[in-house]
Amino acid sequence: MELTYNGKKSKKEILETLPQSDFSKPVSEKENILINGDNLEALRILVHNSNLKGKVDLIYIDPPFATNGTFTISEERTSTISSSKKDEIAYTDNLLGEDFLEFLRERLILARELLSERGSIYLHIDYKIGHYVKIIMDEIFGAENFRNDITRIKCNPKNFSRRAYGNIKDLILFYSKTNNPIWNEPFVPFSEEDKARLYKKVD
């Protein structure tokens, strides 16, 4: 299955577009790096001008959700983004439809080049656009490499007043590059306090 839309570039064109800038020092897989800049250009640099291609085990992406909204942040609320009109603009989410899908597709194609053979990618998206994004990810990573749709509960529906079911979740699409991904069980050992609280009776 494939999504067809105006402005959809070939994979070859995306992969052959070279970065217009470069880092001042080589990028090594042995050290952490924070890139402040355009993420498409950063991905091109990492694919073409670093030694990280095919070496990244885990990618997590939290892109805009194609909401056509403006999101703000304030000094009092530094850890959350909202749609308040009185605070400083953090970002404008104005890419919609096919423009949004191609924006995301270009970045996912480059991200796949960075993944190791046992690498995985997690993409956080919402219920309105997520079903289109899954088809795009099936194209890029292969439907056979779709691992899970993880539900993220984001709010309590008790205050939801619209005449519809409450919008209480986002989804995280989990794909691997091959059929043999690295997998670590997502468990945390009980602390001694947990054991005392949860298991009060001894056999």
Segments predicted by a language model, with ranges:
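Core catalytic lobe of class I
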Residues: M1-D203
